[in-house]
Each structure stands twice: as C-alpha cells, then as structure tokens.
Amino acid sequence: MQTTVPSSVLDIYRMLPEGTRCEVLYNQLSMSPSPSTEHQLISFKLSGLLFVFLEKSNKGIAFAAPTDVYFEVEQSVVQPDLLVILDENKAIIQKDGIYGAPDVIFEILSANRKHDTLKKKTLYEKAGVKEYFIIDPSDNSVAMFAFNGSKQYEMIYEEKGRILSDILGCDLNF
C-alpha cells in the first residue's frame, strides 16, 4: 500500500477530519478548544442579525465558523467566527471554502486573545480584509478596524454591543 506523505502544513491541515477546530496561521497549525457559551450566544445573535440585514439589502452573503478561508498571504487558512462577502466578490466562494479576502470579518475573543487581536489582525490587514471587528464577550465591546485611506488598519471606533459597518451600510445592536 502506498501512502502519501504530506509536504506542507497545508497538506496536513487538509488531512484532518472535517470539523477539527484548527487553523493554519503563518504556516503553523493552531488548535483551539470549543468556544465559550458567551461566545456562542454572541455569534448566534450576530449571525441572525447579519442574515436578516443581508437578505433585505441584497448586498452579499454571510458565513459562520467553521468556514475555511484560504489566504495566499502568509500561507494561512483561518475559520473566522463570522464573515461577509459582498455580491461583487462572490467569485472567491468555492465549494470547499473561501479563497481570498472576505470584505468583512468578525472575531469573538476567546481565551487566547493574542490570537485574534495580534496574529489574525495582522493577517487580515495584509490580506486586504476591508473591515475587521473584534468582539469581547466579557463586556460586549466591539472594536472596528479599517484602512481609512491608508495601507494599515486604524481603529475606527470602539463601542459596546453595536456594529457600525461602512462597507455593509448597517448599524446592528446585539
């Protein structure tokens, strides 16, 4: 019997069983535990709000974790908590995942805060994600990062329980 030896971290990732909570960040595998109940509640509420908004506005489509997002930049595959792809960018949606930068990404902080606030923020910035929202489930605070005319993310606002998106043109309270 002939076996295939993986030649990259991405090959190893693709061999993992479906549903494995794992990402490839900067060509390194990163496992994560199941999210907290607070995390899940926020994700559920926000995904419902986004779904209703996008259905009414016909602007795009939302996906929830676990949806693989493949970035050529930094050889990374991530599973954001929520993401939105506008209609004009739907070509990046493939059967097995998203290949390229979603227009908007939402990450709900977990125990490993550095993962979302530093590593993923840097990756999303390099990949060209237009808006990045970081939600802290401990107090429902939302920090929104965008390019704002520059090549680097700037914090646009920080507020509790409110999503203001210029890209989507929405104001959602959760």
Regions found by a protein language model. Give the residues of each.
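Gly/Pro/Ser/Thr-rich low-complexity, intrinsically disordered segments predominantly at protein N-termini
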Residues: 1-174
